[in-house]
Amino acid sequence: MNDLQFDSLKVFKCQNCHLPLQVDPTMLHLSKSQRELLLPREDRRPGVEEFNLRQESQDMLKKVKTGKEAKQLLKEDFQSSDFLFLRDIDDSIAEKDLKKGLEGDNDDRKSNEDSMVSELDVEDTAKTLSTQIERLSKLFEIMSTSESNIDYPICQECCNIMMKRLKTDYEKAVKERDLYFQFVKRIEKQQLDESDSSQLSLRQKEYTDQTKKINQERERLLLELTKKEQVEEELDAEIAELTRQISEKKANERATRKIDNAKQWDKMKLLNDISSLQYQYETELNKLDQLRKTNIYNESFRISHQGPFATICGLKLGSYEDHKVSYSEINAALGQLVLLLMTISSSLNIKISGYRLQPIGSTSKVSKFLADKEDWETYELYFSSNFSLEKIFKRETDFDKGMESLLDIVKQISLSFSTVVSSDTDINIQDERTRSNDSMLNGGANRNANLRADRLFTESELPYMIDGDRINGISVKLYGAEPNLEWTTAMKFLLTDAKWLLVFCSSKLSLQ
């Protein structure tokens, strides 16, 4: 085959997957018998006569000539047709193609075509490309219009898929055919059985009797069914009524439960509110008791000690060589002491004769009225870094005079307390004789507290006695020198007396 013919086989596409394909060269060299197989024949349609096709095909096959006669016939047929011309072909090949075409075996026909290609030789290669394409188009058109219901050409892969599908259809058709055979045999057997008249009449009689029994049984069952249906209707009505009653009962129970739950919820909320309010009330009472027990003076002026130092509000009052304390801290402590004495005198309305306190923090002062000058003189109650001749000559300074004035003020306040105690004690003794038992129950605690506070000053007065510029025999004057251990001890005694005054003042104020 030349290149022109070979290229002509590439212009076709698979009608299934639409991919270009190459037509097998054997399609250009078909025999007459092969071409006849491609033509549709009415006698090959499915039907009852299909079973006789095999015998008719065998008869036609026997009429086929062999040898030179068959070759001559084939050559004449090919020369008179519009298809391709083939050389002499062996009769056995045509016979085999015809048999395999009648049996519809595509696999055998493919192997036959492969063997035939090796023996064929094209006689006429002068045909044009259009003629070859036209012939192949006619060939595919004939194949497509046949009873196969397949559009040609198709590729090898699509052909394999269709062969599997046709094989499945074939198996289904065989099963259907077998089913028809069985049905036909059954009908034939039934016809043979009914041919016996005696048996038929007996069967008819039995059928009649059986029919009567069936009718009677049917009537009985219908009557029984009617009764059952009536009972069922009654039961359905009773069930519906009971269901309605149950639904109403459940609805009432839900409503009642809802109301009870609401009441319980309100009760729980009320109890929680009561508990919360009671807890808040108790908490506030505890706070009130704590506030009542709290002494504002003790909280404001905390007097304590740290080793050899006395402290007021955490400030050390004193200093010596081994433990130096800054002047600013000492001045602040003296300012707190002045503020404490002024607070006690103003709270109990005690008038200090000849002195006026000026609490100004770390620069507090005290003023003293001088009778000979008939004027007030102010003394500093803080250490100053200013230069003064008194410090050089170790003379009495304003600070020393102020400290002496501070001792005199403490002594006056203690004497005022003693006067108040003596007057209150006389009054309490007279009241004690005239009060009734009920008044004793109401005010006994206050009187006992008052008496205890009175005894504090009637029995021992101040813990450390004050005499001029000395407290417990120790002078509070420095004469311009640095603070020492002796002066620090004197300050400790002074703060101790001040704390006693503070306790007495707190007791009096709590009773009021």
UniProtKB/Swiss-Prot annotation:
Q: A Pfam family matched by this chain, by name?
A: APG6_N
* Disulfide-bond pairs as recorded: none
Query: Any keyword Signal?
Result: no
Task: Provide one Gene Ontology biological process annotation.
Answer: cytoplasm to vacuole targeting by the Cvt pathway
InterPro entries named in the record: Atg6/Beclin (IPR007243), Atg6/Beclin_C_sf (IPR038274), Atg6/beclin_CC (IPR041691), Atg6_BARA (IPR040455)
How is loss of this gene reflected in the phenotype of the organism?
leads to seven- to eightfold decrease of the renal fungal load of infected mice. Does not affect protein trafficking.
Q: Where is this region: BARA?
A: 294-511
> GO: which molecular function terms?
phosphatidylinositol 3-kinase binding; protein-macromolecule adaptor activity
Q: Where in the cell is it found?
A: Endosome membrane; Vacuole membrane; Preautophagosomal structure membrane
Q: What is known of its domains?
A: The C-terminal domain called the BARA domain is dispensable for the construction of both VPS34 PI3-kinase complexes, but is specifically required for autophagy through the targeting of complex I to the pre-autophagosomal structure.
Instruction: Tell me how this protein assembles.
Output: Component of the autophagy-specific VPS34 PI3-kinase complex I composed of VPS15, VPS30, VPS34, ATG14 and ATG38; and of the VPS34 PI3-kinase complex II composed of VPS15, VPS30, VPS34 and VPS38.
Can you tell me which family this protein belongs to?
Answer: Belongs to the beclin family.
Q: What does this protein do?
A: Required for cytoplasm to vacuole transport (Cvt), autophagy, nucleophagy, and mitophagy, as a part of the autophagy-specific VPS34 PI3-kinase complex I. This complex is essential to recruit the ATG8-phosphatidylinositol conjugate and the ATG12-ATG5 conjugate to the pre-autophagosomal structure. Also involved in endosome-to-Golgi retrograde transport as part of the VPS34 PI3-kinase complex II.
Report what the protein is called: Vacuolar protein sorting-associated protein 30
The gene from which this protein is expressed is VPS30
